[in-house]
Amino acid sequence: MKFTIVFLLLACVFAMAVATPGKPRPYSPRPTSHPRPIRVRREALAIEDHLAQAAIRPPPILPA
């Protein structure tokens, strides 16, 4: 009697596990939503570098 109850319980657990669809595995471990934010960040850093170089460069001396 005890064996049949355990067997039925295991069968129910197995049926529930098979019936619920599993999560699809992502292709990469850390999937990114879109590559655009990284590109925008790179462009912003490049613009910041250009502005820093322009600020460091001394202004040209104009003849009087």
From Swiss-Prot:
Coiled coil: none
Start and end residues of each stretch annotated as Critical for inhibition of translation, possibly due to its role in mediating interactions with bacterial 23S rRNA and peptide chain release factors: 32-40
Propeptide residues per the UniProt entry: 20-21
Gene Ontology CC entries for this record: extracellular region
Signal peptide limits: 1-19
Source domain of life: Eukaryota
Keyword Signal: yes
Keywords in alphabetical order: Antibiotic, Antimicrobial, Cleavage on pair of basic residues, Glycoprotein, Immunity, Innate immunity, Secreted, Signal
Site (Critical for inhibition of translation, possibly due to its role in mediating the interaction with bacterial 23S rRNA and rplV/50S ribosomal protein L22): 30
Record carries keyword Protease: no
Post-translational modifications reported in the UniProt record: Proteolytically cleaved at a pair of basic residues corresponding to the RXK/RR optimal cleavage site for furin proteases to produce two distinct antibacterial peptides.
Site (Critical for inhibition of translation, possibly due to its role in mediating the interaction with bacterial 23S rRNA): 23, 25
Glycan-carrying positions: 28, 32
GO biological process: antibacterial humoral response; defense response to Gram-negative bacterium; defense response to Gram-positive bacterium; defense response to insect; innate immune response; positive regulation of biosynthetic process of antibacterial peptides active against Gram-negative bacteria
Note: Unlike many antimicrobial peptides that kill bacteria using a lytic mechanism, proline-rich antimicrobial peptides can enter the bacterial cell to target intracellular processes. 'Buletin' is named after Philippe Bulet, whose dedicated efforts in the 1980s-1990s characterized many of the Drosophila antimicrobial peptides, including Drosocin.
Recorded family membership: Belongs to the drosocin family.
Protein name from the UniProt record: Drosocin antimicrobial peptides
UniProt source species: Drosophila simulans (Fruit fly)
